[in-house]
Amino acid sequence: MNEELTSLTEYQRYGHDYAKYPRRIAEELQRYGGNSFANFFRDEGVLYKEILCDACDHLDINYNERSATSLIEQNMLSKLLKDSLEKMSGREIKELCDGLGMPNIDKVIGENKQVLIASVLTLFKAGGSHSYALAVAVADAMVRQTLGHGLSSVVGKVALKKTLDILAGPIGWVITGALVSINLAGPAYRVTVPACVLVATLRKKLKAE
């Protein structure tokens, strides 16, 4: 399935001013279901990267536009995760990590909160299943904030059951609350920011498998 956005009149007219045609962006992103969607986020296509960089600019996230798309996504997820963790207590961070089966957290729980946050972010950046689980936590909170329901209604419950069970409880709402302060003013960013978070999370899923 090929992208069609660049052939639309709105794209020709407004170019990178995505706020002028958020509905078209939403329609384009929603077209990519199943394997076609997987192919889309494997691609380092110019259009998606432009949308990703625009979202990062809006969220005040540092990145190098010449970096690989996956690295820019990593910067975005890391910043959102860090912001969420900073709003949580040390005990809540431990509960989240224990629930996700993250190792060795007990060894740092006695340390100050910043050490604990740094430990979680290091594990996140290392990749693998725990990194994916943390990305799901951020994506679930983002979808919950913008759509009013969790990630299970978007991607289905089976593959993410353990993680989603944890996020359905108090910890999930803590993360959601931490993301409420994110500026998603305007219809375009209510589409593009969550979409980029979801694409980044799905890319992590591919790498974790």
Swiss-Prot record:
Superkingdom of the organism of origin: Bacteria
InterPro entries linked to this entry: Ubiq_cyt_c_chap (IPR021150)
One Pfam family cited in the UniProt record for this chain: Ubiq_cyt_C_chap
Similarity remark: Belongs to the UPF0174 family.
Name of the protein described by the UniProt record: UPF0174 protein jhp_1493
